[in-house]
Amino acid sequence: MTFNHKKMEPKWQQYWSEHNTFKTTEDKNKENFYALDMFPYPSGAGLHVGHPEGYTATDILSRMKRMQGKNVLHPIGWDAFGLPAEQYAIDTGNDPEEFTALNIANFTRQIKSLGFSYDWDREINTTDPEYYKWTQWIFEKLYENGLAYEAEIAVNWCPALGTVLANEEVIDGKSERGGFPVFRKPMRQWMLKITAYADRLLDDLDLVDWPENIKDMQRNWIGRSEGAEVTFKIKDSDETFNVFTTRPDTLFGATYTVFAPEHELIEKITTPEQKEAVEAYKKQVELKSELERTDLAKDKTGVFTGAYAINPINGEEVPIWIADYVLIQYGTGAIMAVPAHDERDFEFAQQFGLNIRPVLEGGDVTKEAFTGDGPHINSDFLNGLAKAEAITAAIDWLEKEGIGSRKITYRLRDWLFSRQRYWGEPIPVIHWEDGETTLVPEDELPLLLPKATEIKPSGTGESPLANLHDWVNVTDENGRKGRRETNTMPQWAGSSWYFLRYIDPKNSEAIADKEKLAEWLPVDVYIGGAEHAVLHLLYARFWHKFLYDIGVVPTKEPFQKLFNQGMILGENNEKMSKSRGNVVNPDEVVEKYGADTLRLYEMFMGPLEASIAWNENGLEGARKFLDRIWRLLVTEEGTLAEKVTTDANANLEKAYHHMVKTVTNHYENLRFNTGISQLMIFINEAYKQDTIPKQYVEGFVQLLSPIAPHLAEELWEILGHTETISYVAWPTYDETKLVEDEVEIVLQVNGKVKSKITVAKSLGKEELEKIAQEDNKMKENLEGKTIRKVIVVPGKLVNIVAN
């Protein structure tokens, strides 16, 4: 006997919708709980089975917290700007807005079919002008506070496509789409000064409950380094250049220097005989993306400029090379190379026959770089010193000589904020003919994205908005002509603050009401994929800290607890993808097995953070368990089974209280697979009984409801209730019912186990000895033997020594 999910699930989804069951309560007498999902990009492909894993986890918490008497904010929305919709529009001539709306409608249908308890009144969409009005407002505040500025930045320019490409869209110097050549070209771009927040972004990681690996990824991305900036003179020239190093103590081992190919001094210092080679090399580098240039696995390339620098600590002449692995935007765009103690410098020195001088004892630098620590050698006044003392001594010397100073640098660069795209938030800026740049007045926001009948690249490197002359060209009241900014914001913009808008999504006067922000922030739990570990989470923290500084939000950090669910892989353990043809569509699973089965299966697959392969058998197993519950509690006629009675049943008492305690604990700690195991254990116990107390059945159904809400609502109704289960007080347990009053005692003869008995915990030594000697198996083993000694350990064992 089985239940009909095709009738049951739509029935309860309709009930929740008509009764607005999951509308966020804002009762001042209750505690608040904010459970947030990383909102999806509504792609044309729709949901895949990976999406519901994180969504089910937050839904379980949300449903449990409502039953525990909390106000719960559990919202959903759409991160709907972005490249795929624009590409689709360029390829098909369709409107990206219409395409996005269709995709959102499909995602909404799919999400509702899975029974998630979202408050749909709070739905947001980053492409809605009433939403992006506030994205633009935040940009204006950043600009007013000196944190948004324009700069000439080298971008990936593809003449054939007439557009600028992101690093990810360039493969081996060619466009991912079409395989056209891509060049590095300087263009004016908007930048956000995230570096101003580097220290706070680093230090405040200590305030949040996040996975340590994610914190480490952010720390590495920010990359705070303490060291020294050292000035090198160029031989036979008045020019100097600076390098930053974390190891100024190894200066005696610096045997050459390397410039980024874009370094401004190259032009001036290259000798006539090296000019041709240097120019050819620079052209070659133009075709490479940053990722390719810094790939550790690739062969080192470079070229000698013909010029020499003077090592400031020992006066030696050292050659100046250029190489692609040095990037102009990191540090000073020049490095001092210590090949004896740095793997990359060692490989480069070997490739080009450059001098390798060890300055730390240990290792064999004829074979490989020694990157460990040891006392200093070949280092004059630093000889014999350990690392920390030597660094201090070297910096003191540099500062005394006036050729260096202590310095802190960051790997973090300012955020390149403009995109040469149509489908994004317009940047609310006007460039006037007299050179002034102004913001669109705040009372004129939102600056609407204009409709375009045809979206095509401008051909100049500007966005397709540059083609819309009526929109771009403006005149002020004094007849001064200007042009609107044609770049749009990156997709990261709308997702950097969306969690604030959910708190007060209809507010037309502010991002959200201050009191409401104070009540709901920070987000209690944020669940999503680890692929957003750095960029999204770092950008959102940056914007949040800025909004904190200008008094908009009341907390320093946006997300108190972060959890990354694992990836659901294809049956063959490969990542699910269209090209592999192994994507599982949740629609098909819901049709065949039901949404509750899908939810149960995804939570039972393994630990939430693990990446696990999809398995159809596991899905069938999940459905069988739900059918087993149904058969235990419901008759063929759909009424409550006769074995469910109001009578007590001492045999189930301990199992019930143990289940309530452990399931609650496991849900709280996101250990859903072990929580489900406890539900299964209880059902196994219940099957062995002639009667099951109705109170225990009700408690069980409540514990099941966050995982399988449709089935739980149906069972709740069969149990005689007329209201939804969603707000019924969460079951409680009695600790005294869990105390063990019996223990298992091992009975041994000469140290070998012969029998086991269960006795009252309170029995003393004499009683245990007596029971042991009367045990039938012990009698058999003692026959014909003389008892020499009896060892009794109460609560554990009785060992009889006999011969």
Swiss-Prot record:
One of its GO terms (biological process) is leucyl-tRNA aminoacylation. This is Leucine--tRNA ligase. Belongs to the class-I aminoacyl-tRNA synthetase family. It holds the Pfam family Anticodon_1. One of its GO terms (cellular component) is cytosol. Its main location: cytoplasm. Keywords: Aminoacyl-tRNA synthetase, ATP-binding, Cytoplasm, Ligase, Nucleotide-binding, Protein biosynthesis. One of its GO terms (molecular function) is leucine-tRNA ligase activity. It catalyses: tRNA(Leu) + L-leucine + ATP = L-leucyl-tRNA(Leu) + AMP + diphosphate. It is an enzyme of class 6 (ligase). It comes from the Bacteria. InterPro entries: aa-tRNA-synth_I_CS, aa-tRNA-synth_Ia, Leu-tRNA-ligase, Leu_tRNA-synth_edit, M/V/L/I-tRNA-synth_anticd-bd, Methionyl/Leucyl_tRNA_Synth, Rossmann-like_a/b/a_fold, tRNAsynth_Ia_anticodon-bd. Its EC number is 6.1.1.4. A motif ('HIGH' region) lies at residues 40-51. ATP binds at K578. The gene is leuS. NCBIfam families: leuS_bact. The keyword Protein biosynthesis applies. It is found in: Cytoplasm.
